[in-house]
């Protein structure tokens, strides 16, 4: 039921009294991005605490019952994130799963016959990390369907006390015995495994166990509790309206300067200028579907041609908590980034939605549909034939950069108007993602560039029909990353397949634990390969993998001879490369016009890297005397603005029909310059100036390789 999006139950205690042997406390078969948190259930003589678990469960404790959780697939077949849980006294098993796709972090199961049981005749994808089994008298885990390619089991750092048998294979009756009274299973892998991209995947069962003296308590410090409510200040009490019309910008800015914990009730809060938090600022929203921070379409602070500009920014090294809000940059705000996150390892973002997906609730020209129950506006960015020029006009929704890290839980970033749902760049600060869904983007769902020391649990990609050419995950110059329960899904409306779910460039020490690359049952168009490495031409063809390791030591599939004068294939897979340019060190740059990407071929290493991904169509490239990269773009002025990015009051802020064609858009050349080693932070618009200001230019560039129209240069 699509109406159950963002349903939630939290801060509740439930008790089933005697005489209810078939009773279960909660049936949690929600649609998407729903949660149960801070809930304690006493099942007693009843059947189960939770049946048909939803997408996210956190801080739950279940006592008694036949089962603590009894679940099938969540809707719509996503993985299930179970974080910080406690089970005790179940009569059959703490958890019973049938293709649940559970990702379990920090679970403690005590005084039960079985901790986790996979149902008979069913493959499953199970990942567990940092868990405790105590007094589990039959077996820790019951496995099944050993020969099925979809069986993917990975268990890491499972501490056991009084668990004589760690695992049992149901049909073969093979047993994995425990060691000593107290021991730790450091690694357990069961299913198709590839130790590198050069390996042919084979079904394995690997166990690494070591004795320990005692159980170490579970550390939940990376998901801190909110401050006490007595310490909160209600933004409404400071004068904020939240009506979708009034300008609440300065009230928010003043609140950040004065208060540490700002509570935001439901409402549509118009924020017209960037909001930057202090080191200790916490933003606490009531609900991510109804507590909206909105920048109206055509907002000058986020409009026009230029460097990324964030609605919300956290400071470097901050310990911020941001939760329960919806960041919405409307449809037309070319420079917009919803959130630029630079807070440190101790920071925390959870239960946050990023704009998009709800096409009927947008704003323009002072009009709004502030109440979701109001009739949708007659003017939207979408045309009658569902072709939208607004799509892919903004920067990334969530941008984690400049040493940003911390924990991110239960995030939904589904926005056709942004160039990617998640962009992580230039950070080796440890980070963790506990459940994130990325959907509906046109070119990229997620990009990691120069990132290290992150763990990503429950990464869910839903590539929609508008994203027929979308790369789900791009990893560029990354190392020491772990992905657990990686789901890449292409919907039934797809008309063709896509080359890869994961694309890598110059990466090493990347581990995928449980890879599920699939399409809807009604179609066969999924991603051809689960992973493709650009520079080695190596790929993981299998769609279902228990474990896949990218070591970074893989050799090229087709070695280069280094013979002078011989043409050889270096890299492939581009749509239409253009704009070749060379810097003083021999590095070569090129671009893809439609896909809006810029690449570098390093003269020393011979490796190709994706270096930039901005929402403008690059036409030609050049290098100046200081090796800055100059980019010529085909720029379409933002609706409501002139070509020079000044406001045009005679034009609406959404699409219009005019003499320039169906949409009345005119193409004009715009130029910017970047440093290739960090384009995002060095983006500089190059203004049009009078040549008389430069009597003796050092270098003159004529972009003769390709033009937009005959008269534009």
Question: PLM features: residue spans?
Answer:
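Extracellular/periplasmic carbohydrate-active domains that bind, remodel
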Residues: 1-558
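Sequence-structural signature of mature extracellular/luminal beta-sheet repeat domains
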Residues: 556-713
């Amino acid at each position: 039921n699509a109406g159950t999006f963002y349903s939630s139950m939290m801060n509740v205690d439930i008790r089933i009294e005697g005489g209810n042997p078939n009773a279960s406390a909660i049936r949690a078969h929600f649609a998407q991005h729903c949660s149960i948190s801070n809930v304690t259930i006493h099942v007693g003589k009843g059947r189960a605490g939770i049946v048909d678990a939803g997408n996210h469960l956190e801080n739950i404790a279940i006592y008694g019952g036949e089962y603590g959780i009894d679940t099938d697939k969540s809707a719509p077949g996503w993985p299930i994130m179970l974080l910080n849980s406690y089970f005790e006294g179940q009569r059959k098993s703490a958890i019973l799963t049938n293709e649940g796709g559970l990702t379990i972090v920090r679970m403690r199961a005590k005084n039960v016959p079985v901790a986790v049981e996979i149902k008979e005749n069913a493959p499953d994808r199970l990942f567990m990390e940092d868990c405790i089994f105590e007094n589990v008298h039959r077996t820790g885990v019951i496995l099944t369907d050993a020969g099925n390619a979809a069986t993917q089991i990975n268990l890491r750092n499972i501490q056991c006390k009084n668990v004589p048998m760690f695992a049992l294979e149901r049909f073969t009756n093979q047993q994995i015995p425990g060691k000593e009274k107290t021991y730790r299973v450091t690694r357990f892998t069961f299913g198709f495994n590839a130790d590198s991209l050069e390996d042919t995947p084979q079904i394995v069962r690997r166990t690494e166990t070591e004795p320990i003296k005692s159980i170490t308590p579970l550390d939940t410090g990376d998901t801190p509790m909110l401050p006490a409510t007595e310490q909160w200040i209600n933004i409404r009490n400071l004068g904020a309206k939240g009506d979708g019309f009034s300008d609440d910008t300065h009230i928010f800015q003043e609140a950040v300067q004065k208060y540490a914990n700002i509570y935001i009730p439901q409402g549509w809060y118009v924020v017209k200028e960037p909001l930057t938090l202090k080191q200790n600022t916490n933003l606490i929203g009531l609900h991510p579907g109804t507590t909206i921070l909105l920048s109206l379409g055509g907002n000058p602070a986020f409009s026009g041609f230029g460097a990324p500009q964030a609605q919300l920014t956290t400071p470097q090294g901050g310990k911020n908590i941001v939760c329960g809000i919806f960041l919405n940059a409307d449809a037309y705000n070319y420079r917009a980034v919803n959130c630029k996150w630079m807070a440190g390892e101790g920071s925390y973002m959870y239960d946050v939605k990023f704009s998009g997906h709800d096409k009927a609730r947008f704003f323009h020209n002072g009009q709004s549909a502030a109440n979701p129950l109001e009739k949708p506006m007659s003017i939207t960015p979408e045309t009658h034939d569902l072709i939208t020029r607004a799509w892919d006009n903004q920067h990334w929704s969530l941008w984690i950069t400049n040493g940003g890290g911390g924990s991110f839980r239960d995030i939904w970033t589904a926005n056709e108007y942004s160039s990617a749902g998640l962009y992580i760049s230039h950070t080796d600060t440890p980070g963790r993602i506990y459940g994130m869904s990325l959907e509906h983007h046109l070119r990229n769902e997620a990009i990691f560039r120069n990132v290290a020391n992150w763990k990503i649990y429950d990464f869910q990609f839903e590539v929609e029909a508008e994203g027929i050419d979308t790369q789900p995950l791009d990893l560029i110059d990354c190392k020491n990353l772990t992905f657990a329960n990686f789901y890449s899904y292409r919907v039934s409306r797809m008309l063709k397949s896509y080359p890869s779910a994961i694309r890598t460039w110059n990466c090493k020490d990347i581990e995928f634990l449980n890879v599920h690359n699939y399409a809807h049952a009604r179609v066969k168009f999924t991603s051809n390969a689960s992973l493709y490495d650009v520079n080695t031409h190596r790929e993981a063809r299998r769609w279902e993998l228990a474990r896949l390791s990218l070591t970074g030591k893989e050799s090229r599939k087709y070695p280069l001879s280094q013979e002078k004068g011989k043409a050889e294939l270096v890299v492939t897979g581009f749509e239409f490369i253009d704009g070749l340019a060379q810097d003083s060190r021999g590095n070569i740059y090129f671009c893809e016009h439609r896909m809006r990407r810029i690449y570098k071929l390093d003269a020393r290493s011979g490796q190709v890297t994706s270096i930039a991904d901005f929402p403008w169509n690059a036409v030609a490239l050049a290098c100046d005397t200081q090796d800055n990269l100059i980019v010529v773009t085909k720029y379409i002025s933002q609706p409501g603005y002139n070509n020079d990015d000044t406001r045009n009051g005679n034009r609406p802020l959404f699409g219009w029909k005019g003499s320039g064609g169906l949409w009345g858009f005119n193409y004009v050349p715009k130029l910017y310059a970047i440093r290739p080693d960090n384009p995002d932070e060095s983006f500089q618009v190059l203004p049009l100036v009078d040549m008389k200001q430069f009597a003796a230019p050092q270098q003159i560039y004529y972009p003769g390789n390709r033009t937009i129209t005959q008269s534009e240069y």
